[in-house]
Amino acid sequence: MSAAILLAPGDVIKRSSEELKQRQIQINLVDWMESEGGKEDKTEPKEESKAEGSKDGEGTQSESGQKEEGGKETKDADVDRRIHTAVGSGSGTKGSGERANENANRGDGKVGGGGGDADAGVGATGTNGGRWVVLTEEIARAIESKYGTKIDVYRDDVPAQIIEVERSLQKELGISREGVAEQTERLRDLRRKEKNGTHAKAVERGGRKQRKKAHGDAQREGVEEEKTSEEPARIGITIEGVMSQKKLLSMIGGVERKMAPIGARESAVMLVSNSIKDVVRATAYFTAPTGDPHWKEVAREASKKKNILAYTSTGGDVKTEFLHLIDHL
């Protein structure tokens, strides 16, 4: 069996580094993050200089201390904004706890916490007997592939219990940048619809009360109708931010699939690389949506070779496809 050298995008290699080490495959990774980090460091002093200009008359030492504290508060606020549970009822964790206490015996009112031991749900069942859903097909495929649990994608149903996969869990599941952007767009649409729909629900309930007064004979039926129709409006759409694998599994059920690693002797791949220097000796390359800015040039040079195998991601879980290719080359 001849040894193969496989070219792939840097972020794909980085996400798969642990599995590659298990297979005793060498890694040649050209890291592009350092250069980007240098650019970010250069832009930060500009923001500080603007802050200094707006605080004339104050001491230099007190200004620097306040700026450091302000920077921490801003970061904390950004994190808090990302963590939310219920659309249309406030983005803080308190709203989630109130909703949970009113509607069901749940113990995971705190967002992002380790709610694995709470009565958050059995299998993929959420509050009020509903089922947890996700916002994109890619996330649903990744969860099914990793944990063996089939989960539905949200289809504009109300009420609904939606899982928002947050950054740390996105990396764990191998969600692509496009998949992350799609989830963000759907969240924005949901917030917009929920905000516009609140007034419409209030008007609808007011009109129903007027009709109930006009039809005195049907008063009892009107009361029953009002109760049943107001319940889903009160429940609405719940969004649960999930950062940990433990919490996700407590919500949807299932266990992580442990695949036996394939050793170097069983795999034909000797080296994986994103370096343009390895194009000359590469025997195959794998392309996928990537944040590696240098990959486009590497792939272009690789495609010019006559005797090289080209593989492309089908749009599923990129990490899973990459490792599957390595195991079957």
From Swiss-Prot:
Keywords: ATP-binding, Capsid protein, Hydrolase, Inner capsid protein, Nucleotide-binding, Virion. ATP binds at residue 110. GO terms for molecular function: ATP binding; hydrolase activity; structural molecule activity. Residues 27-130, 189-232 are annotated as: Disordered. One of its GO terms (cellular component) is viral inner capsid. It is found in: Virion. Residues 36-58, 65-83, 96-109, 189-207, 215-232 have a biased composition (Basic and acidic residues). InterPro entries: Orbi_VP6. It holds the Pfam family Orbi_VP6. Residues 110-129 have a biased composition (Gly residues). Its EC number is 3.6.4.13. It catalyses: ATP + H2O = ADP + phosphate + H(+). The keyword Nucleotide-binding applies. Homohexamer. Belongs to the reoviruses VP6 family. ATP dependent RNA helicase essential for RNA packaging and viral transcription. Possesses ss- and dsRNA-binding capacity. This is Helicase VP6-A. The lineage of its organism: Viruses, Riboviria, Orthornavirae, Duplornaviricota, Resentoviricetes. The gene is Segment-9.
